[in-house]
Amino acid sequence: DARIEHVKKQITPFPSFASALKALGIDYGNLIESDLRKKGCGPKDNPWGHFEKLLNKEIKVDSAVYNSSLPTYRISWEGQTSNVRERLITLSRFELESDVIEHFIDDVESDILSNPYLISEWCARNFIEKVSTRTIDLGAFPDPTIQGDNVPVPPFAAESILDTRRLRSLVVERLYSVLTDGDTLVSIKEMEDYLRDIMTEEDKARLLRLCS
């Protein structure tokens, strides 16, 4: 479908870049991202490299309201461990609010670098409905029409809708969904039927895209 392809071309591979900056305590994240776009950061580029250039004065934005804060931002960024920086970059691949990103910056025991579906599991347990397994799919499945040259790679990437990490996330979502509805027990058969229905639905959607 041409409309789907058009939408994909407009999607950045790092949709929560500005939210990640906010989680780090950096103000004006949306403005910084907008200025970086104007200074050569394309829609499929990784904005984090451009952000470092801004901090190092390799990119200059005249009269920007945040210019006086850039030295402080640089200290904050360079003061983070490589693990925290990598987690921030990873988290920015998904459509997340800054409070969710902040949680996973602090929760260094959560191995989101190997299993990004831990994010949707945690959100399900905390009834954060804006983030689902499918939210993570968009950043975990390699798709050059969305991510350009920044496609995810193993062990982070998901290669199949049957990825066990993904299936576990779907199961956790279902369990907490029925809990909200007042049910406390779900049979194995009910869960199998639920997963089978999802897989069938996704297979049909994929076939329609291939035929359109």
Summary of predicted features, one role per range:
Residues 1-212:
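Helicase P-loop NTPase motor core of nucleic-acid translocases
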